[in-house]
Amino acid sequence: MPRKGPAPKRPVVADPVYGAPIVSQLVNKILLDGKKGLAERIVYDALAGVAAKNGQDAVVTLKKALDNVRPALEVRSRRVGGSTYQVPIEVKPHRANTLALRWLTTYAKSRREKTMTERLTNEILDASNGLGAAVKRREDTHKMAESNKAFAHYRW
């Protein structure tokens, strides 16, 4: 383990086109094999598609989609005695944002549309309307936390 302490958190640089840090985080989540230009093209085309289909600002729609996907609770495994309990805990804002972006991109990749741009466009639109696999994942996570509420006193 390093002796200097934890690495400092670096501020997220806003992306050059929309001027929103959340867009650059989405680009970094889409990024594969260091091909940032390709990732930027996918995200920008997807956001242009969102604006065209929705008729609203793409960044506003993306933020609404992330609000619908962002979890408030999750479960963590905690070993007490000989048994392991799923303990519900509140999710910190930074982790909630990261999970929302991760789920959005993961479920966009698993969609059936032909191009990644179309998949991401439709997943963002579905999530902003409260539909889609990413929103379902959040609901499942909340349901799991709700059903394990009895073990909340094991929180640490």
Curated annotation (Swiss-Prot):
Protein name as annotated = Small ribosomal subunit protein uS7
Mention one GO molecular function: tRNA binding
Query: What GO terms describe the biological role, i.e. biological process, of this protein?
Result: translation
Task: Quote a single Gene Ontology cellular component term.
Answer: small ribosomal subunit
Listed InterPro entries: Ribosomal_uS7, Ribosomal_uS7_bac/org-type, Ribosomal_uS7_dom, Ribosomal_uS7_dom_sf
Q: Summarize subunit and interaction data from the UniProt record for this chain.
A: Part of the 30S ribosomal subunit. Contacts proteins S9 and S11.
- Answer whether the UniProt record assigns the keyword tRNA-binding to this protein: yes
Family, per entry: Belongs to the universal ribosomal protein uS7 family.
* Purpose of the protein: One of the primary rRNA binding proteins, it binds directly to 16S rRNA where it nucleates assembly of the head domain of the 30S subunit. Is located at the subunit interface close to the decoding center, probably blocks exit of the E-site tRNA.
Q: Which keywords appear in this protein's UniProt record, sorted alphabetically?
A: Ribonucleoprotein, Ribosomal protein, RNA-binding, rRNA-binding, tRNA-binding
- Key word Ribosomal protein present in the record? yes
